[in-house]
């Protein structure tokens, strides 16, 4: 059964009517082609209206869609000869992060990303895409290996956040995230990051220090979930929709604020509607990003990355004179 989002219910009802009429026409000697054509035209108009006016909360729902493509879905479509590497060489192998070496249009690269499950069993195995410290240390190990061999790094970001459990804290969750931020800032190879779903807090940032950071059109990137923000601000997690409106978590907002570099368009209705087509959109942006970064020397890459993050958070003070009575 198809998973339907809250704002898509009018579309689901209309599609159901069209399907019923087609089925009735197929088994009865009755022609409903005019009615079907009218309903299909109405459906197309309604789809255009809905998807052209998505609210931040609508985009949160799309980013969390259970069928939304994962890192491994994109690896399968964008890379060849992918060889997954395991373990952080300190504690264990965290399956909430996948990474390895691959070829991207013939170019050797290292690709790393958060990985959610496709069903309950896999989600439990991958901890719902929320990494432990060993996941971030595995990612850093692969990044330093990529630096050693001169391979560009491509990171896919999709997590609610780093796992906040007791064991993760005991093994140094905050240190692992901080270490990744520090080390990624100084990598001497090109780093391109793409937010493909949810970009949650430090758990996302630990894979997000790149020369370019891009976001899929319906992905989100924030310091906290809308539910968490609502619980803190208004003591009521049910006000998540209100929080989403004010948090500036969408790709459009973050592009305007200079946090990300480019918005990658999604197929209408969300990336889950056509993964192959969505991969092509990502491919176009990755190719262009690497084409711009590959000619740069190590010092230039580090300087460009430094300037990018130095500008985030800039503000302009108002010059308006205010008289005090």
UniProtKB/Swiss-Prot annotation:
One of its GO terms (molecular function) is acetyl-CoA carboxylase activity. Residues 35-292 form the CoA carboxyltransferase C-terminal domain. Keywords: ATP-binding, Cytoplasm, Fatty acid biosynthesis, Fatty acid metabolism, Lipid biosynthesis, Lipid metabolism, Nucleotide-binding, Transferase. It is an enzyme of class 2 (transferase). It catalyses: N(6)-carboxybiotinyl-L-lysyl-[protein] + acetyl-CoA = N(6)-biotinyl-L-lysyl-[protein] + malonyl-CoA. One of its GO terms (cellular component) is acetyl-CoA carboxylase complex. Pathway: Lipid metabolism; malonyl-CoA biosynthesis; malonyl-CoA from acetyl-CoA: step 1/1. The keyword Cell division does not apply. It is found in: Cytoplasm. InterPro entries: Acetyl_CoA_COase_a_su (IPR001095), ClpP/crotonase-like_dom_sf (IPR029045), COA_CT_C (IPR011763). GO terms for biological process: fatty acid biosynthetic process; malonyl-CoA biosynthetic process. Its EC number is 2.1.3.15. Pfam families: ACCA. PANTHER family: ACETYL-COENZYME A CARBOXYLASE CARBOXYL TRANSFERASE SUBUNIT ALPHA, ACETYL-COENZYME A CARBOXYLASE CARBOXYL TRANSFERASE SUBUNIT ALPHA, CHLOROPLASTIC. HAMAP family: AcetylCoA_CT_alpha. NCBIfam families: accA (TIGR00513), AccA_sub (NF041504), PRK05724.1 (NF004344). Belongs to the AccA family. Acetyl-CoA carboxylase is a heterohexamer composed of biotin carboxyl carrier protein (AccB), biotin carboxylase (AccC) and two subunits each of ACCase subunit alpha (AccA) and ACCase subunit beta (AccD). Component of the acetyl coenzyme A carboxylase (ACC) complex. First, biotin carboxylase catalyzes the carboxylation of biotin on its carrier protein (BCCP) and then the CO(2) group is transferred by the carboxyltransferase to acetyl-CoA to form malonyl-CoA. This is Acetyl-coenzyme A carboxylase carboxyl transferase subunit alpha. The gene is accA.
């Amino acid at each position: 059964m198809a998973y339907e989002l809250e704002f898509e219910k009018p579309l689901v009802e209309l599609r159901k009517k069209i399907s019923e009429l087609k089925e009735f026409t197929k088994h009865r000697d009755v022609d409903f082609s005019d009615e079907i054509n009218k309903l299909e035209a109405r459906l197309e108009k309604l789809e255009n209206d809905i998807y052209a006016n998505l609210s931040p909360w609508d985009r949160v729902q799309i980013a969390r869609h259970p069928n939304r493509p994962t890192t491994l879905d994109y690896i399968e479509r964008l890379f060849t000869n992918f060889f997954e590497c395991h373990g952080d060489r300190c504690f264990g192998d965290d399956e909430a992060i996948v990474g390895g070496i691959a070829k991207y249009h013939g170019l050797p690269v290292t690709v790393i990303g958060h990985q959610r499950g496709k069903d309950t069993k896999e989600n439990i195995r991958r901890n719902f895409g929320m990494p432990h410290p060993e996941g971030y240390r595995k990612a850093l190990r692969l990044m330093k290996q990529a630096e050693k061999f001169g391979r560009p790094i491509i990171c896919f970001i999709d997590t609610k956040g780093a796992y906040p459990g007791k064991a993760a804290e005991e093994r140094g969750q905050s240190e692992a995230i901080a270490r990744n931020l520090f080390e990624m800032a100084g990598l001497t190879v090109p780093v391109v990051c793409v937010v493909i779903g949810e970009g949650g807090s430090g758990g996302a940032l630990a894979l997000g220090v790149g020369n370019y950071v891009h976001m899929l059109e319906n992905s989100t990137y924030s310091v906290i979930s809308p539910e968490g923000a609502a619980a803190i601000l208004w003591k009521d997690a049910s006000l998540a929709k209100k929080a989403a409106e004010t948090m500036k978590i969408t790709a459009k907002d973050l592009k305007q604020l200079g946090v990300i570099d480019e918005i990658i368009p999604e197929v209408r209705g969300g990336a889950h509607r056509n993964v192959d087509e969505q991969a092509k959109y990502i491919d176009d942006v990755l190719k262009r990003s690497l084409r711009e970064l590959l000619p740069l020397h190590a010092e230039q890459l580090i300087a460009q990355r430094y300037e990018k993050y130095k500008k985030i958070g800039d503000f302009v003070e108002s010059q308006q004179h205010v008289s005090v009575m």
